[in-house]
UniProtKB/Swiss-Prot annotation:
Identification of the protein by name: Outer-membrane lipoprotein carrier protein
Entry similarity comment: Belongs to the LolA family.
The protein's role, per its UniProt record: Participates in the translocation of lipoproteins from the inner membrane to the outer membrane. Only forms a complex with a lipoprotein if the residue after the N-terminal Cys is not an aspartate (The Asp acts as a targeting signal to indicate that the lipoprotein should stay in the inner membrane).
Record text on subunit structure and interactions: Monomer.
Domain of life: Bacteria
Originating species: Histophilus somni (strain 2336) (Haemophilus somnus)
Segment forming the signal sequence: 1-21
UniProtKB keywords: Chaperone, Periplasm, Protein transport, Signal, Transport
């Protein structure tokens, strides 16, 4: 009897691994159809009970491989830039810039997956597919993110994405005015503003 139970367990693990691989491959195939993307977005923040607590707007720009930029405009300006190696976060309100190696922030910053085909990046997540929505959960228990959802159609049209934090707070980004213009790599280069506090986590 024990032998049969062990066999069943092995089969279930095998099926789970195949399902994960299929979901990852399908998501990567869809994302690969986006060479460049520029879009406006609206942001909706809700608490664990589903109550809307904040709205915002901004602009997102992507370029494969590994280039990502988000400029939040309302209710408060902020900027996130991934230049392929470093993830920059700039908060003009407190005049602070934080820099981390992309590799060190993957479990807390799944946005990077939108432009990455690096197998080591995807190995840090569990991926499930439900129609055009892909549910991505970090394997690391230290992550502040519970899951990251991407809704992308078969033809590569990215509709929205969202993060759900461990405390239940959700951030939904709905894309509009989507275009695919030529984007210069310089757009994804961050220049440190004068007079800001610089927290360089890459040296630690």
């Amino acid at each position: 009897m024990k032998k049969y139970l062990n066999l069943t367990a092995l089969l279930l693990v095998g099926i789970s691994n195949v399902t994960w691989a299929n979901a990852v491959n399908e998501l990567q195939n869809r994302l690969n159809k986006i060479d460049v993307l520029s879009a406006d977005y609206t942001q909706q923040v809700t608490d664990a009970q589903g109550k809307k607590i904040q709205q915002g707007s901004g602009k997102i720009q992507l370029k494969r491989p590994n280039l990502f930029r988000m400029d939040n405009e309302t209710p408060q300006e902020s900027q996130i830039i991934a230049d392929g190696k470093t993830l920059w976060f700039y908060d003009p309100f407190v005049e602070q810039v934080t820099a981390n190696w992309v590799e060190d922030t993957l479990s807390d910053t799944p946005f990077v997956l939108l432009t990455s085909n690096n197998p080591s990046h995807w190995q840090q997540y569990i991926v499930e597919q439900k129609s055009d929505t892909f549910i991505i959960k970090p394997k690391s228990k230290k992550s502040t993110i519970k899951q990251f959802n991407i809704r992308i159609e078969k033809d590569g049209v990215l509709k929205n994405f969202s993060t759900i934090e461990k405390d239940g707070q959700s951030n939904l980004y709905i894309l509009r005015k989507i275009t695919n213009p030529a984007l210069n790599d310089a757009i994804f280069t961050f220049t440190l503003p004068k007079g800001v506090e610089f927290d360089d986590q890459r040296k630690k």
